[in-house]
Regions:
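C-terminal regulatory/interaction module of P-loop NTP-utilizing enzymes
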Residues: 1-209
């Protein structure tokens, strides 16, 4: 597997969402991290070649479907806290993922997503993936409707589709997720962009498909 290959090659092993790995599986890495070796049935004892390193990522704020990481694992790792990218970096990420999208429009979509992280009605906002999906969905939705992806209604429907499952309401919030996203969209797109366009639209009166 990837672990044995990385050890034999003396290369980097990257583990995504390490806190979603079952504890009994994760504990296999303890000997690898402390002794640089692992014993595999039929393969025997495997030593890590010089240069072998392991990097793992996790979202500490997402507890659904995650497993407890033991203190023994934490004791063998160094931790770096990584914040969100800057608005400019996120815009570049979105535009790179959806090069057909207008870059100024991508910047506004990123602004919408960044607003979700600080909105008083939301306890969890969206990552840059939400902005990427909004841009991609808007392109596809525009083609299906025979409209430009920059059309305000196309953009709003794309945002509702992409963000409504990602953001979480605070307890006691009186508005729906769709209403909050629509409000944020109108707040961002009501302000004239560099080319003077305004993208404010009315809130949907029914469910968005």
């Amino acid at each position: 597997g990837p672990l044995v290959e990385a050890m034999r090659a003396g290369s980097l092993l990257y583990i995504e969402e390490i806190n979603r790995i079952p504890e009994e599986t994760l504990n296999v890495l303890i000997t690898v991290m402390s002794e640089g070796e692992i014993t595999v049935p039929r393969l025997g004892r495997i030593l890590a070649e010089p240069g072998f390193q392991m990097i793992a990522a996790m979202n500490p704020f997402d507890s659904v479907g995650t497993a407890r990481i033991s203190s023994a694992v934490y004791d063998r790792m160094c931790r770096i806290s990584v914040a969100y990218q800057s608005a400019e970096d996120e815009t570049n990420i979105v535009h790179r993922a959806s090069p057909a999208s207008n870059k100024q429009w991508c910047a506004q979509v990123v602004d919408v997503v960044r607003h979700t992280r600080a909105h008083s009605d939301l306890r969890t906002g969206s990552s840059v993936r939400g902005a990427i999906d909004t841009a991609l969905v808007a392109q596809s939705l525009g083609e299906l409707r025979g409209k430009d992806a920059l059309d305000p209604l196309v953009g709003l429907d794309a945002a509702l589709t992409s963000l409504s499952g990602r953001v979480k309401l605070r307890e006691g919030a009186v508005r729906s997720v769709e209403e909050v996203i629509t409000d944020i969209w109108n707040t961002v797109f009501a302000a004239p962009s560099e080319n003077g366009d305004v993208g404010k639209v009315n809130a949907p009166t029914g469910a968005t498909n």
